[in-house]
Amino acid sequence: RREVLLAGIGPGSEALMTQEVREAIRNSDFLIGAPRMHKAAAACIKREQTEGELPDVKTAYQDFEVEEALRLHHDWQRAVILYSGDSGFHSGTRKLAERLKKNGCSFRVLPGISSVSYFAARLGISWDDALLASAHGCEFDAASALKSGCRKIFLLTGGKNGAGELCRRLTESGFGHVKVTVGEKLSYRDEQITEGSAKSLCGREFEPLSLVLIEEENDER
């Protein structure tokens, strides 16, 4: 019986993959995902696989692309679809899971370490009192969230909604004073963490896919 696994590989570094995901990759005959996911999987295989054939790979991003690939290749007995971070936090897992369910395809989801969990740990703080949101490929009004009383926000950024642009919007909305911490290339060797006020970081260039922590520390607001 064919096994389809939707796996979260963690924030990026191969070292932060769960053992369950490592084993799934090692025992797969086909891997599907974005190039960055393939790179992490290749590092895992290189480290752990000592014999046998390497799995084939296919680059696919959209849920319909993955579903089509699975439909066309009945010879795949153990296909693993790779997603960054955790499978349940702003992941492509949701759309693919809905599509597979609709088409009667059985699958299993393997969780991973989320970028938020990793970033919070690096900063030595908790995240259970924070709002988790995304501005990657969608709009999110951080200023409105702060006005409504939210004091801590973890925000995924990307595309036109980068960290520098976020800080510009916050400053223009009267929140130039809030503390902003930007995590770039989290978990990689060239990881960079930058901290400052929204005003001081306004318009700066950051990695397209960065994670931002916004903190309102002014008790008078």
Residue ranges and their predicted role:
Residues 2-6, 78-79, 149-221:
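A contiguous loop/helix-start segment that scaffolds small-molecule binding in enzyme catalytic cores
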